[in-house]
Structure formats: structure tokens, C-alpha cells
């Protein structure tokens, strides 16, 4: 348990930041799932539209350093390949 006022404040801040970061990660996972679902449905136009919006989410979260930029690039690359590979 934090004893000093400074340590208590840092604990509060860490908790708030953790909650915010978890919600951002959840948003990331949801965006990726939406693209995968559109690909499975076979609708290329919808998949491309959802992919564009998910790229924005991925970049935003990487810019905030919630995920590493290389992980963001990997997600974008794999989703792009999946969308382009649709028949």
C-alpha cells in the first residue's frame, strides 16, 4: 500500500491509465475482428471500408504508444493481405 501522498497519487494515476489503455486495446481488437468478419462474409467493398477505419484506429493506438509501432505495422500488413486476397 502506498504510504506517501505522492505514492497514493501515482497509484491513482496508474490505475486510471491502465483502465484507459485497456479500453484502447479493446477498441483495437474490436476493429481487427470487424475486418476479419467482413472478410469471412465475402464482401470485398465492406471489407475495404472497414479496413480503412481499422487502420486509423491501429495508427492512433500506436501513436499513443499503447502498442508498439511494429505490432501496429504487422496488424495492418496482415489485414491488408487478407483483404487483397479476397476473390
Curated annotation (Swiss-Prot):
Entry-linked InterPro entries: Ribosomal_bS20 (IPR002583), Ribosomal_bS20_sf (IPR036510)
Highest taxon above the source species: Bacteria
Region described as Disordered: spans on this chain: 1-28
Matching SUPFAM superfamilies: Ribosomal protein S20
rRNA-binding as UniProt keyword: yes
GO biological process: translation
Listed name of the protein: Small ribosomal subunit protein bS20
Organism: Thiobacillus denitrificans (strain ATCC 25259 / T1)
Lineage: Bacteria, Pseudomonadati, Pseudomonadota, Betaproteobacteria, Nitrosomonadales
